[in-house]
């Protein structure tokens, strides 16, 4: 599939670095090569030495076909709506807050390990890789499914990311989605708008569906003028959709004309 080739061609060409090492100044390249000799870069997905994400892991990504995904929640295998969104009253938070939702891949090997390495193990070099996956997905969706995702990227006035809580920022030392968003905007040429601030301190990963929705409600505040803007809201993982729905609802409350969601992975 051509979409696989696009991802492989751009990402694998970078090797173990986020960008091709031939563009590094000679001194930096020598330092990098010395460090690689002492402690080789290992794949975030399988620990194989040589590249930050190896070719086997890239080709193992379970990419979601935008022609057959749920436009409400980004789940795979929903030609119109997925089995959850097609039931009255289900996933209503995402359906009401987001105009459309698009996801890159199913949250299955190797993505959980890659995302964990980036968020919790401090492998910040993965940000451009994940941004590239988001960018490729949006471009592909516009062409492959124009009736569903036309202008999802080209029609966006700005990109907004789901921010980390203050507690998560302190724990990790950086906002993981801000770094991805900056790389994504460099690729796409769309402006970045740091529009949201998130309150709250809890980790949602161990919460159930209803608990996540309650936890996410009221956590966000818009701190930039988004009135009349068409926004592309990005995040890493959609599980129940509560986090993205709450962020999108806040942007709509602040006057955004439209909010589309884009995420790296979809739990399904």
Predicted regions and their residues:
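Glycine-rich phosphate/pyrophosphate-handling loop used in enzymes and phosphotransfer proteins
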Residues: 1-268
């Amino acid at each position: 599939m051509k979409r696989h080739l696009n991802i492989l061609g751009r990402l694998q060409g970078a090797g173990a670095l986020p960008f091709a090492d031939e563009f590094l100044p000679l001194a930096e390249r020598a330092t990098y090569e010395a460090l690689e000799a002492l402690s080789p870069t290992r794949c975030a997905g399988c620990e194989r030495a040589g590249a930050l994400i190896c070719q086997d892991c890239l080709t193992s990504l379970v990419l979601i076909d935008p022609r057959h995904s749920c436009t409400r929640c980004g789940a795979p295998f929903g030609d119109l709506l997925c089995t959850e969104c097609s039931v009255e009253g289900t996933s209503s938070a995402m359906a009401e807050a987001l105009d459309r939702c698009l996801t890159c891949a199913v949250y299955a090997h190797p993505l959980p390990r890659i995302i964990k390495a980036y968020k919790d193990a401090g492998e910040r070099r993965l940000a451009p890789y994940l941004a590239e996956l988001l960018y490729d997905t949006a471009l592909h969706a516009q062409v492959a499914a124009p009736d569903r995702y036309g202008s999802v990227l080209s029609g966006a006035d700005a990109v907004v990311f789901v921010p980390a809580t203050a507690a998560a920022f302190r724990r990790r030392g950086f906002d993981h989605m801000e770094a991805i968003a900056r790389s994504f905007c460099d690729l796409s040429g769309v402006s970045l708008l740091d529009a949201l601030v998130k309150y709250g301190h809890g980790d949602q990963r161990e919460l159930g569906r209803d608990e996540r929705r309650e936890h996410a409600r009221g956590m966000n505040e818009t701190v930039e003028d988004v009135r009349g803007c068409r926004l592309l809201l990005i995040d890493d993982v959609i599980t129940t959709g509560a986090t993205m729905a709450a962020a999108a609802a806040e942007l709509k409350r602040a006057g955004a004309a439209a909010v589309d969601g884009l995420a790296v992975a979809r739990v399904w």
